[in-house]
């Protein structure tokens, strides 16, 4: 477990405060988990973003009438901190009985508070239900590898040694799987995800990728660190010209988390999958 997470509200009984309370936000430094992976803030081998989508966003108009919407938050992958998810939920719940004179005022408040917690500017979009409904759900790009016949019996820790490639062949392809699962390092609750791997490099054995992803099944870590571990293990094996790993997790507590890590420019779509 991340030492800072022990002091977070995650896994503890909490009072749900209904008026504006930015002090609910609990930042967790990324540095400890980066150190486990052998990287620092100065040597990050990726660009990226963590998309958070909030489906329980509500506030009051000056008339007292409530409004509901969906919030989209983009936290830079090189920000000093992640924001612990239960504290994020408690903060958002604290807006429920808070009056905002305009949508711009709400958005400015969210940007200020979340950027302060993350340690870097956080992008905020507040979208109407009609906007999100019109967007619908999308399918992941590329080839799904989930139908491959694989055997595995060890799920406790990620096993990069399972990964195989053909160093004599260079390919460019996009693969995806819906079989990613890990556990919250504090509560042990399951985190269900889908993941896309897009790369140009040594030809990756598809069955080995699937068994590797399945090996995360009992691993305890936050969403962001799981994706960064996948990214580094693939980068070390494939020596790619470019590599992108993008996971979209099933929501819990009204929030879903979607980490994106890439060698190149950041241009991911923040669009819902069928399980989101």
From Swiss-Prot:
GO biological process terms held by the UniProt record: queuosine biosynthetic process; tRNA modification
Question: Per UniProt, where does NADPH bind?
Answer: 85-86, 252-253
Presence of the UniProt keyword Oxidoreductase in the record: yes
> What are the positions of the active site?
184, 191
Binding-site positions, substrate: 83-85, 223-224
Q: What is its EC number?
A: 1.7.1.13
Q: Which InterPro entries match?
A: GTP-CH-I_C/QueF (IPR043133), NADPH_dep_7-cyano-7-deazaG_red (IPR050084), QueF (IPR029500), QueF_N (IPR029139), QueF_type2 (IPR016428)
**Which Pfam families does its entry note?**
QueF (PF14489), QueF_N (PF14819)
Entry-linked SUPFAM superfamilies: Tetrahydrobiopterin biosynthesis enzymes-like
Q: Which GO terms describe its cellular component?
A: cytoplasm
Q: Which reaction does it catalyse?
A: 7-aminomethyl-7-carbaguanine + 2 NADP(+) = 7-cyano-7-deazaguanine + 2 NADPH + 3 H(+)
Q: Keywords assigned by UniProt? A: Cytoplasm, NADP, Oxidoreductase, Queuosine biosynthesis
Enzyme superclass (EC): oxidoreductase
Q: Which pathway does the protein contribute to? A: tRNA modification; tRNA-queuosine biosynthesis
User: Subunit info?
Assistant: Homodimer.
User: What is the protein name given in its UniProt record?
Assistant: NADPH-dependent 7-cyano-7-deazaguanine reductase
Q: What is the lineage of its organism?
A: Bacteria, Pseudomonadati, Pseudomonadota, Gammaproteobacteria, Pseudomonadales
Q: Which gene encodes it?
A: queF
